[in-house]
Amino acid sequence: IDIETASDENIKDCGVYRYAESECFDLLLVSYAVDNGPVATCDIANGETLPDDVRNALTDKTVIKKAFHVNFERICLSVYLRRKYPEMFDFKDSTGSYLDPVSWQCDMIHCRYLGMLSSLDDMGRLLRLKEKKMAEGKELIRFFCTLHQEADGSILFHDKSDAPKKWEKFKAYNRRDVEVELKIQRYLSEFPVPEFVWEEFYIDQEINDRGILVDT
């Protein structure tokens, strides 16, 4: 699974939790493949919704979800689903505000466990994939995912109506990321990560989800 999002927060400065909790945060695109099948893209920003089976799979602990740097997908999808479907969450403590990490696996961690590279782009080049991450992605993310000041002084996000052709390319970029991830996963599957490493990862994620109490 791979997503595209927008927020007024700079994720490099504040991290994914503050980024996703912003009132301006929005989920734009979701691309996914089920059991190595064809890639589907949901244009959330333009009224499409996740199919019920996909939404249910996100909360089903028996269904393994994979992404490259999965913490981003898990937290952002948690916030999106929590706002639209609060009944899906158990708010007994802060960890209940997020999708349970035990059914999520991170391809970046898998790569690093094998002593390989930690970016999707670098892994595509390393494995000499014919179709790699699209180079236009950074410019498209700047255009659609960050705030812009217009000539009249207003500050807003660009959307499909501002550049329809760019939006279609943005969707293709999102879809391509999943296609590249699937090819990388086929290679990684020959060298599985031991279960104890995933257990350590789940503990790490729970620690981050719980956070710390701070007097203000």
Predicted regions and their residues:
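Active-site-proximal helix-loop-helix substrate-binding element of RNase H-like nuclease domains
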Residues: F25-L27, Y32, N36-S189
